[in-house]
């Protein structure tokens, strides 16, 4: 047994770090070291068993006599699950190491230094304001990084987030008030997101952030705090505060009023800062090509960029599979790509979950189309039976005070069709605004005549084969919907004990999570003998027909053949003996209610017991005596309990952990009721679907879902497909009445008296044949029920092509290539499509299934209208004010009580509304978030960061077009001309790598890999390096070099925009249309231009990459030195000291690039062994090259020495304070261990800082 020793102190953040890591180990594939989950011990380990002096917490003992590991960093890394920190050597793994190191060496000391004074642990002479300043300095890099990232190293919490969050736990609890949290808004958002993850919450509970009011109890070790201040000191501090207040007031006044003589800001400058004011105003009829002949606007504006392109794409037919070929049947060596959209429900508008699905699917579709494949992405909408009927009923009640029964079936269905027309158009509008390259001429609705015919055909065929059958069984019944629902439409709410839940239709909450015991008197017993049973649903005792005990239970052997008396009914209940009873639970006796419990139903079948149903479809009691008759089920619960008490049969009530089944549509408590329904036999179809995955005919990605697939298929039950609704496909089955005395009348559960048909006439002919009578003796009554929505959705891959008719589309596009959807509907939809496709067409409906993660909000919460975190993607695209978000709630179907709760959620998450981000930024951001298998905690602020990326693309292209010049003519091909410079070769090499990573990422559905490769190329390589290096070349006298650079630059723009196009179709089209073409017959649009492939971009150049990597290493070192010495406005000379001639030659080759990138003066390579000039600061660029930056003449040595001496004195004082603090009486015994460790780290840092200061002092002394 492994043991994790931790501190019980609630603020012991090193121990908390270990405990959270252990939680992640439990939730994942186990601890990274491969051992068992450790036992937690809230005390130090015995000193006799540890190899280090106690107490050193946290500590992990890996089994008796095993390895000991201590200290938060080591223990957390050992407990953290393998694979969640990125593969070794990967970018993610490097980022994890970087931020863990930063948390331990920078954040922890700064956090402790700022927090300890607030806890009464300030040392002598310690300045709290300076400590807060140090914390702010440590938070700044974190704030900048988190501006564009949800987590520190990837799309889910890693060890880096764990280290940083626990380091900042004390400041967020005790120091950082609301105003400070606004300054570090990104850090605060990230901190809140992390601590709301289940693994963090399990350890930390609800983290309450510091409100600004503090009441802190003196902590142990308080004897080392500073003595009380003298009157003189207090007076001095009061003066300081007074000066500070005056200064702040002066600043506030200056901000509100311009200084004398100062001009007010010009309106046009204000407009320039506002990114949303630039619009496209040229008269362009819908469907005509946008005019891009004018000057590019100064900055990127989504409104300007996205105007006019989509109607033109649609009108030109770019999204149709026929584009560029005589017909869809024409052979294409590139192949066919077909995918159907998961048809969104017509229950309302699309949300960000739909936007994620759309972004992934459209990027894949555009990639396949640009690769030259015959590509079809088929649109459609789903009628969503239950969901739509519920929404429309709510709307009718809210607006007109009517329910559907008052309106009547036909009138109600007309209202639903109106709703569908309105919402369907809205959904298609949203999809178009998202840039979806769907073939709208093939759009369909699941209740269109073509698709309805497929549904009828499928039902009739399956019914004729006996796969669909009618049976009376227990079903999941929603009394609110007045309909049966399937198993996977039932949510399970776990209760630990007594809980009051809101139930639709009841004013007061209903009690659950209790076990009620009561007695049945044994019939004919002289001793007043009784049998005590217990139940969580006491109202169902009115439907009891027996009491069951175990055959081997000695307590009841004497009761064989006997009965008990029901206290409220004129019937006796036999005592039956059945193996299903657990003798150890309760009294070992169980009440049997076959009509309202699945286990009881099976017992009843074995013992031939009557099933007495005591509830109608609305949950009111029937078949019971007064006073219970007609009572709603949960009112009856109270009445039965009172009656039992009155008769002296009540025996007790106690808390009982249980699971309450809830309808996921109505939130009603589901009742098991006996009802005749239509079922699909799933056994054989499930075996076939499971075998298809086993054989590899069907791939499910991520592969982790395959195990779940097999488990579900192996344990599948028959599927109830009838719903007691009005909206949906009416079941094409008819109850038969035969007007012939020789044929007895039938009953509903008897399947022989039901017939299916494509038409009523066909059904009548079949019925006549079945009963051997003429058709005129047959009367038919069509079933009032409709089919489960998932039945028609399961036919979608071939119903859209008109199956069973053999159309051209069906022969070309079925089976499809890919099914892409969220993992939450793997069994709702994907499994049904596979089973029905194999059964009806003898083909798999698609070859691959890719399941993306589920979108949650920035705090990890499920999207819910009542939480106010359901976001319309158009609000992210266009932006919306907080009031606008509130107004949407008022126009929704939310109950008034939920509206205020939702408003609070919106105020907390979007205090300033949602900024305009644009479609491209939203799409790119969603794909960048998509990590296989993990849910996505979406922070809208991060999407804004990708809008800034769009602006970078815009400015880079604008600069590049100026550099190319008006008369520029690109080469017919992108082949290098042979005269490329080193940096030309380098950027081509990096571009080739981006092309490789993009194609491999698309093939593997690794969207973050693709977005990272493209983002890095454009931002860090093209903009930050190549364009900067290009400026002196384009302005120079070497025309050959300039021409060669222009061709390379054009290639970068051409290939780079094509790479980005699947993710960012609007901005890339806008920029691509402004580029000159290589050939006159080039494609009209970027969306049908060939996607770059490695064979086209075979420019990998390791030699150039090594050279530029050295240049960039030198540049980073020079920039760091310039920052250290505040040389922001000067260009200091730089001397490179190399270890060998090869490095020297390489450094010489890149010296001009270093000069440009580092803003240096002369960049010279020193001869081997030659000394550097006097007065240089030194830094290391690599193990083969050091930098000497000339400071002589650029800085005042005497002044710098003065500053360094002051800095040295302060560092010495700080070191002395820490040493005195650690030597103080009671320090090791009373000060928390984590504080001791923080002090030790801070002392090491201070001593290292002193050594650096001494080196700098020595340097400047030589310059005097």
UniProtKB/Swiss-Prot annotation:
Residues 234-248, 260-275 have a biased composition (Basic and acidic residues). It comes from the Eukaryota. Residues 89-219 form the GST C-terminal domain. A motif ('KMSKS' region) lies at residues 862-866. The modification Phosphoserine is found at residues 437, 527. Its EC number is 6.1.1.9. The modification N6-acetyllysine is found at residue 645. ATP binds at residue 865. One of its GO terms (cellular component) is endoplasmic reticulum. GO terms for biological process: valyl-tRNA aminoacylation. Keywords: Acetylation, Aminoacyl-tRNA synthetase, ATP-binding, Ligase, Nucleotide-binding, Phosphoprotein, Protein biosynthesis. Can be regulated by protein kinase C-dependent phosphorylation. This is Valine--tRNA ligase. The gene is Vars1.
